[in-house]
């Protein structure tokens, strides 16, 4: 699990419709598996569809590797439905060791609180990692900008700032001066309002700058803007460097891979214990001679191609969730 996968899962459960997208290798299939696992814990039904068989077979294979293949029904074409009916007794048999999956510890509220605490701690780590990446990227961009700025801009050496300011205030003042230079009043009210603003701005300039005229004209502000730009670049880089150093020290005390492994282990223990309570203790799984809605009580995860999914059950059969893998490859007719 990573930050983007975690956000995708939260979005999937927080919205009626959610889109998960990304290039190959970014964990979209793993995200589908995590969503399916959460639905199984909640005893919900889910239909997983795709425009091709290989995509849904990939999902089934990954669930089987986790020992969860007995929850799935791979349907679709007449051939696949026939194969399911004929092989379900063997290929979809409930694991013989399922009773050993049960753990009384997972029934306690404390165990769920532990999982929640682990998830929140991991979320904090992910947020720090992302903020660190953004800060490094911003710092690199500012360094490049400053290099070009210093090569192309002349700064009046006789003008200085009286005191240090945070970058946010420098940027605000920079924009304010730039707007004052470019502002063109239109009408009597605008001219009156601008006269008041100009009076107040000149008072601020006298407090903030040394070596600058105490009675400047509007065009004189152009001499101040390069100084503010340079100060902004310097101060913002100092702020980012300090933030990067702070986050790196925070992350150095955390073992993210170990935290992910611990959360995954505890989550799987909880899932398996719930499955043991549902399918263990001598549970007799019926053998289905036909594909009917009752099948969903035993096989809450149904997989099919998009084109064939409508033919699996009666039209009135409802699933709690539908996951469409590789949705961009599905035509609007079959997707509907």
PLM regions: where:
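Walker A/P-loop
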Residues: 15-35
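SF2 helicase catalytic motif II
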Residues: 317-331
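Phosphate-binding P-loop
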Residues: 9-17, 38-41
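Conserved helicase NTPase catalytic core signature
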Residues: 1, 171-318
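Short, conserved "post-DEAD/DEAH" coupling segment immediately C-terminal to helicase motif II
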Residues: 311-314, 330-336
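Pre-P-loop entry segment of helicase/translocase ATPase cores
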Residues: 1-11, 84-105, 272-278, 290
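The Walker A (P-loop) glycine that initiates the GxxxxGKT/S ATP-binding motif of P-loop NTPases
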Residues: 22, 77, 326
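P-loop NTPase motor core
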Residues: 45, 53-144
């Amino acid at each position: 699990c990573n930050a983007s996968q975690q956000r995708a899962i939260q979005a999937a459960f927080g919205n009626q419709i959610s889109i998960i997208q990304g290039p190959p290798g970014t964990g979209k299939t793993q995200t589908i598996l995590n969503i399916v696992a959460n639905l199984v814990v909640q005893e919900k039904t889910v239909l997983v569809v795709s425009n091709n068989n290989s995509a849904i077979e990939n999902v089934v294979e990954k669930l089987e590797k986790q020992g969860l293949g007995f929850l799935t029904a791979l349907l679709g074409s007449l051939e696949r439905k026939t194969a399911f009916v004929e092989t379900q007794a063997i290929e979809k048999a409930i694991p013989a060791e399922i009773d050993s999956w049960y753990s009384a510890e997972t029934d306690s509220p404390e165990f769920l609180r532990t999982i929640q605490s682990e998830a929140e701690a991991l979320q904090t780590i992910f947020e720090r990692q992302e903020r660190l990446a953004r800060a490094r990227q911003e710092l690199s961009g500012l360094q490049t900008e400053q290099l070009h700025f210093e090569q192309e801009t002349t700064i009046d050496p006789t003008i200085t700032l009286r005191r240090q300011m945070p970058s946010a205030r420098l940027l605000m003042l920079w924009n304010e001066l730039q707007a004052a230079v470019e502002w063109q009043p239109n009408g009597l009210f605008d001219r009156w309002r601008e006269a008041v603003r100009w009076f107040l701005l000149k008072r601020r300039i006298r407090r903030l700058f040394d070596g600058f005229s105490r009675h400047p004209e509007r065009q004189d502000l152009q001499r101040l803007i390069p100084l503010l730009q340079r100060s902004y670049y310097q101060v913002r880089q100092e702020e980012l460097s300090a933030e990067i150093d702070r986050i790196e020290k925070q992350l150095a005390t955390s073992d993210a891979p170990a935290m992910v492994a611990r959360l995954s282990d505890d989550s799987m223990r909880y899932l398996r214990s719930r499955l043991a309570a549902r399918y263990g203790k001598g549970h007799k799984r019926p053998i289905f001679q036909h594909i009917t809605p009752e099948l969903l009580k035993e096989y809450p995860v149904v997989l099919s191609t998009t084109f064939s999914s409508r033919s699996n059950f009666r039209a009135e059969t409802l699933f709690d969730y539908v996951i469409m893998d590789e949705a961009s490859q599905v035509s609007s007719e079959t997707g509907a």
